Amino acid sequence: MAHQAHAYHMVDPSPWPLTGAVAALLLTSGLAIWFPFNSLILLTLGLVLLLLTMYQWWRDIVREGTFQGHHTPPVQKGLRYGMILFITSEVFFFLGFFWAFYHSSLAPTPELGGCWPPTGIVPLNPFEVPLLNTAVLLASGVTVTWAHHSIMEGERKQAIHSLTLTILLGFYFTFLQAMEYYEAPFTIADGVYGSTFFVATGFHGLHVIIGSTFLAICLLRQIRYHFTSEHHFGFEAAAWYWHFVDVVWLFLYISIYWWGS
């Protein structure tokens, strides 16, 4: 691209939105085929294409923002608004799951035995693994804030250490959640309780994996001297997203694990 003589956001022609859309189509189609037919071909294809798209698109944005200087103050302002709108859309996404949960639990139908949890369902103890998960995510919220303050104050080593700790806590949360799913006394097929529990907590788990990936990219960029104390919006966006994931978990814990049990 030729040098631009203005400060505004002019996007270069890019194939990655298209490949990302194709990857999303393959992933959803692959899931729909995997459940009834136990075939992983389409799902694997979608995952590979998604990973390639993520790598290439992130590389392009890092190049534009870090080395070509395209992320001027007006562009950063636009990116901030974009991230705020994205998180707002995610709030409404999770609102649907909470709506389904409260719709089912506040007025249980006779088919559920007129009670919540439904007859025959043994809920998980909210004061065991779920409480540990809450502590892990709250601790990761503290460490990501520590990383942010370290970057703003130019404390490079502290930023790397705190960011590494945040990512490790994120992966530990994912591991605990996977163990909980494996040992749960009910499944996604166990009526409305099973489906609302696994869909809500499952999508939250997916968001934790996405957030951990986002922070891992930020860690690599911090190691490679991409962030300065004034110019680090990539990290800020990841931190906002991580705090959003934290807050959603608190609502899930209070609603589904504690009150719902």
Swiss-Prot record:
Positions on the Mitochondrial intermembrane side per record topology: 35-40, 106-128, 184-190, 257-261
- What species is this protein from? Tetraodon nigroviridis
Q: Record keywords: Transmembrane helix included?
A: yes
- Alphabetical UniProt keywords: Membrane, Mitochondrion, Mitochondrion inner membrane, Translocase, Transmembrane, Transmembrane helix
A GO molecular function for this record? Answer: cytochrome-c oxidase activity
InterPro entries linked: Cyt_c/ubiquinol_Oxase_su3, Cyt_c_oxase_su3_dom, Cyt_c_oxidase-like_su3, Cyt_c_oxidase_su3-like_sf, Cyt_c_oxidase_su3_a-hlx
Hey, which family's this protein in? Belongs to the cytochrome c oxidase subunit 3 family.
According to its UniProt entry, what is the function of this protein?
Answer: Component of the cytochrome c oxidase, the last enzyme in the mitochondrial electron transport chain which drives oxidative phosphorylation. The respiratory chain contains 3 multisubunit complexes succinate dehydrogenase (complex II, CII), ubiquinol-cytochrome c oxidoreductase (cytochrome b-c1 complex, complex III, CIII) and cytochrome c oxidase (complex IV, CIV), that cooperate to transfer electrons derived from NADH and succinate to molecular oxygen, creating an electrochemical gradient over the inner membrane that drives transmembrane transport and the ATP synthase.
The name of this protein is Cytochrome c oxidase subunit 3
Q: What is its subcellular localisation?
A: Mitochondrion inner membrane
> One GO biological process from the UniProt record?
mitochondrial electron transport, cytochrome c to oxygen
